[in-house]
């Protein structure tokens, strides 16, 4: 058997070469795996970011859709309300038979509908056939009389027990104040007279006197709560004006 040293070297070199090739391939595989591992995280991060962006866009789309629906509904409600308001204005602008009757008979409006179509001026109170003003200006009896005249009225004249009850109810809410009425006399020895010249009847109410030795001549009358007194005409007080009207 011949010995071939070159073949041995080839075998040895071949083996060695193959060994080196195997190691080289192993290193390349390891490097490839490391490279793929290193490249993986950026792609995952990008995928997560894209997912979040998609979710945000979806939420925005839902919100915008909801707002659009709400605006559409509110717009339709506004148009509907405007329609009813315009219809109400048309109805109120058209006079009816009842409104014409109320304008002719104002007291009917007060009694039946409560609408303020009163023949009385502002701040006056209507009762039966008269308007009343409870003036809060302090004046003597003569000054109060002039004030009522300037307003086209007279100081109060009480004609009935019902009217007296109405006046008492009004002044009782001001227990610290007294109010001049249209009852006076020129001197102590003569009867009491209303402003229209008619004589006072004690059957309606009694006049309590405040006469004293110092003030012997109280020739004017005022009402305090539910009691009617004579008083010096020069004493400042409030007053009640009355204006009658035809039914």
UniProtKB/Swiss-Prot annotation:
Post-translational modification comment from the UniProt entry: Phosphorylated on tyrosine residues in response to beta-glucan binding.
GO biological process, one term: regulation of calcineurin-NFAT signaling cascade
Expressed in which tissues: Highly expressed in peripheral blood leukocytes and dendritic cells. Detected in spleen, bone marrow, lung, muscle, stomach and placenta.
Membrane topology: Single-pass type II membrane protein
Transmembrane segments annotated in the record for this chain: 45-65
Disease / disorder: Candidiasis, familial, 4: A primary immunodeficiency disorder with altered immune responses and impaired clearance of fungal infections, selective against Candida. It is characterized by persistent and/or recurrent infections of the skin, nails and mucous membranes caused by organisms of the genus Candida, mainly Candida albicans.
Protein name (record): C-type lectin domain family 7 member A
Lineage: Eukaryota, Metazoa, Chordata, Craniata, Vertebrata
């Amino acid at each position: 058997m011949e010995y071939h040293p070159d073949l041995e070297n080839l075998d040895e070199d071949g083996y060695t070469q193959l060994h080196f090739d195997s190691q080289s391939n192993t290193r390349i595989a390891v490097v490839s795996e490391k490279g793929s591992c290193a490249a993986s995280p950026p792609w995952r991060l990008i995928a997560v970011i894209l997912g979040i962006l998609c979710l945000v866009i979806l939420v925005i789309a839902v919100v915008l859709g909801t707002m659009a629906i709400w605006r559409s509904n509110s717009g339709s409600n506004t148009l509907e309300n405007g329609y009813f308001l315009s219809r109400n204005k048309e109805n109120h602008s058209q006079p009816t038979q009842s409104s014409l009757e109320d304008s002719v008979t104002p007291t009917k409006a007060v009694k039946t509908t409560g609408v303020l179509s009163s023949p009385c001026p502002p701040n006056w109170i209507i009762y039966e056939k008269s308007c009343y003003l409870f003036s809060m200006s302090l004046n003597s009896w003569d000054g109060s009389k002039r004030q009522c005249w300037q307003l086209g009225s007279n100081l109060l004249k009480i004609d009935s027990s019902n009217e007296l009850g109405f006046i008492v109810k009004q002044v009782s809410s001001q227990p610290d104040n007294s109010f001049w009425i249209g009852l006076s006399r020129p001197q102590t020895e003569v009867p009491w007279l209303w402003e229209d010249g008619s004589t006072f009847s004690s059957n309606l109410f009694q006049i309590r006197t405040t006469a004293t030795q110092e003030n012997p001549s109280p020739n004017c009358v005022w009402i305090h709560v539910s009691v009617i007194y004579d008083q010096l005409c020069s004493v400042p007080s409030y007053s009640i004006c009355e204006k009658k009207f035809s039914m």
